[in-house]
């Protein structure tokens, strides 16, 4: 089935943009921050509120879709074996950055059909960067077509990610990062895997490495 003619991707993009503005305009205090399982693993009341908003608004656009979100909220079915449409949501990717107003966090929404990704939307409201991609139609940054870089490691920036709550392979990770440091022009760690991957898609980085990412 051709989903491109069935799904209103522009409407989804607008919802993701509105969710990003909720994050940008947030007034965070310590009583709105909670710990999840693992070291330095946080969730804020804004993670929950933004996910609720996304589920409610995206349901209006694609009522038949299921939802797999990072946070436990109503409407989040978290079904892994789906043959139909399913939204995958990270309401705030880069929560620690968000907590400290580091301004490198994003709203990340993917859409899958029959267990295959067909579209993705990543929005950083702090610099108004909207990354979009639809299967078969290419990837874009604010409407401009983007491509992965042609250059190799020695001619570009290498990026990586790590988290203290997923620290079982950090020794291996930092050995590889040391090699990337020696062989590249520079190494960066942004703190948002979705944004760092988009940087590779846009040609700003040549590689992104992280040992463990939760879906």
Regions found by a protein language model. Give the residues of each.
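Short, isolated positions in well-ordered beta-strands
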Residues: 118, 146-148
């Amino acid at each position: 089935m051709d989903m491109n003619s069935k799904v209103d991707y522009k409407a989804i993009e607008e919802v993701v943009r509105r969710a990003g503005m909720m994050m940008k305009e947030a007034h965070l205090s310590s009583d709105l921050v909670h710990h999840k399982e693992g070291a330095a693993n946080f969730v804020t009341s804004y993670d929950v509120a933004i996910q609720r908003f996304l589920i409610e608004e995206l349901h209006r656009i694609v009522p038949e879709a299921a939802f797999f979100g990072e946070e436990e909220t109503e409407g989040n079915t978290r079904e892994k074996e789906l043959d139909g449409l399913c939204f995958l949501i990270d309401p705030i990717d880069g929560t620690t950055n968000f907590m400290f107003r580091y301004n490198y966090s994003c709203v990340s929404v993917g859409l899958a059909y029959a267990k295959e990704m067909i579209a993705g939307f990543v929005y950083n409201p702090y610099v108004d960067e909207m990354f979009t991609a639809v299967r078969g139609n290419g990837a874009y940054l604010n409407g401009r077509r983007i491509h992965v870089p042609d250059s190799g490691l020695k001619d570009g920036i290498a990026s990586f990610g790590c988290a203290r709550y997923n620290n079982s392979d950090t020794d291996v990770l930092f050995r590889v990062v040391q090699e990337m440091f020696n062989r590249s022009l520079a190494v960066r760690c942004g703190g948002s895997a979705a944004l760092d991957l988009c940087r590779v898609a846009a040609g700003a980085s040549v590689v992104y490495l992280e040992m463990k990412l939760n879906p």
